[in-house]
């Protein structure tokens, strides 16, 4: 999938059909009810479940209240512009609770952990691990064989469209609770220490830490051994 630029994302959101899907459990004299053709029904006897758009389901429930004894509605979004990514055929490990929007690219053998939030237009390279509760903003790009530590935020940019998103090159390790501001590029093989706030580009093969992040040293063997990427965790 080719990465979308900001204007393409804005157009996608503007022109998408906004959705308020609902799931309704209902019981009553359901055999007397004619269900709308654009509502999916799973009815057995006097009880069942229906799925549909609230704009269709709401008047349906009102019109048939004489034959509906009771119902419960489940709803988790309102006028949503972007569906979630269809993950069934993604060649990666994606754990429960990750929220990944459509138009996201995920490479082979990547790992997306619980609670991660991946916004539209983001790119995650082959073998990269996105740890728990990480946020990748719109169009944020992470290269191959990286580790983005738990709770970190890589700023993405959709608005204003002139701003640039974060780019993380290959073989980068980002510690926990790091914030990388928009427009920053982290060079190949760099290490960002936990808790850092990265406000400017990071040179390849360097170690940075602090608020704001500053270069501490060039990557040495000791640091490399402590930040090793384990391929065993990426096997499917």
UniProtKB/Swiss-Prot annotation:
Alphabetic keyword roster: Acyltransferase, Amino-acid biosynthesis, Diaminopimelate biosynthesis, Lysine biosynthesis, Repeat, Transferase
GO BP of this protein: diaminopimelate biosynthetic process; lysine biosynthetic process via diaminopimelate
Annotated EC: 2.3.1.89
Any Pfam family: Hexapep_2
Function: Catalyzes the transfer of an acetyl group from acetyl-CoA to tetrahydrodipicolinate.
InterPro entries documented for this protein: DapH (IPR019873), DapH_N (IPR013710), Hexapep (IPR001451), Hexapep_transf_CS (IPR018357), Trans_hexapeptide_repeat (IPR050179), Trimer_LpxA-like_sf (IPR011004)
EC main group: transferase
Keyword Chloroplast listed: no
Alphabetized PROSITE patterns for the sequence: HEXAPEP_TRANSFERASES
Protein name: 2,3,4,5-tetrahydropyridine-2,6-dicarboxylate N-acetyltransferase
Biochemical pathway: Amino-acid biosynthesis; L-lysine biosynthesis via DAP pathway; LL-2,6-diaminopimelate from (S)-tetrahydrodipicolinate (acetylase route): step 1/3
Protein source organism: Listeria monocytogenes serotype 4b (strain CLIP80459)
Gene: dapH
UniProt superkingdom: Bacteria
Family: Belongs to the transferase hexapeptide repeat family. DapH subfamily.
Keyword Repeat: yes
Catalysed reactions listed for this entry: (S)-2,3,4,5-tetrahydrodipicolinate + acetyl-CoA + H2O = L-2-acetamido-6-oxoheptanedioate + CoA
HAMAP family named in the record: DapH (MF_01691)
A GO term for molecular function: tetrahydrodipicolinate N-acetyltransferase activity
